[in-house]
Design a protein with these regions (language model features):
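Active-/binding-site microenvironments in catalytic and ligand-binding cores
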Residues: 1-217
Length: 217
């Protein structure tokens, strides 16, 4: 189903798409997926129905909150790794629907114990209640400013006006990102570093999770 407007995030950059329900005069259906085609967002319904006319999309608030917490947590981890490990870049990221995530970094010489020790400063940032804001800069500025683009392989797509979205954590970090985040770091549950794996000669994989969810429930 294609709608004129939608409040749902289609996913990308390692973040899962929003979940929700579509309601219209003739019924309702869970939204099983979101797909971009022809520059428009299509809502894939879980049931074989025909929907038309005025419709209402309701996002799954609990799932979106979890994604916001997890995504903000990965930004904090990213910032601390970048600052403490010589500007190490991200080589991969994936957030999961059980409140866990993994981030891969180009860290061939890193001490895994020092990486595990980042759990305490991550949670200290949470306790500091730092504001999280978004601003837009030109592509040229994003590409020429050290540290704004942290991934070795991908960058958020520009807007129709050629601007790049930058997520700022007050006093801590600025980086390009198109996903959803908290308005304040204090709105997150604590985060635990679950495991660190060596993935090849260069990559270290850090697995983290929200305390109280999934394996940390």
């Amino acid at each position: 189903v294609r709608l004129k407007d939608s409040p749902l995030y289609p996913g990308g950059g390692g973040q899962l798409p929003d979940r929700g329900v579509l309601r219209w005069a003739g019924g309702e259906s869970a939204i099983a997926g979101l797909e971009m085609s022809g520059g428009r967002l299509w809502h894939v319904l879980a049931d074989p129905v025909e929907a038309s006319g005025v419709a209402l999309v309701e996002a799954d608030a609990a799932f979106r909150q979890m994604m916001r917490e997890m995504h903000t947590g990965t930004h904090i981890l990213n910032a601390l790794v970048f600052q403490n490990f010589d500007g190490a870049l991200v080589t991969g990221v994936q957030m999961n629907d059980d409140g866990t995530a993994r981030m891969d970094f180009d860290l061939p010489q890193a001490d895994n114990d020092k990486l595990r020790a980042l759990e305490a400063p991550i949670n200290e940032v949470m306790r500091q209640n730092l504001a999280v804001n978004c601003v837009y800069v030109t592509q040229e500025e994003a590409q020429s400013t050290p540290g704004l683009i942290r991934s070795r392989s991908v960058a958020p797509p520009p807007t129709d006006e050629g601007m790049i979205r930058i997520v700022e954590i007050e006093g801590l970090d600025r980086q390009a990102c198109g996903g959803t985040h908290l308005a304040n770091t204090g709105n997150s549950r604590p985060i635990s570093i679950l495991k660190i794996d060596n993935k090849g000669r260069h990559n270290r994989r850090i697995r983290l999770g929200l305390v109280g969810l999934g394996p940390l429930a």
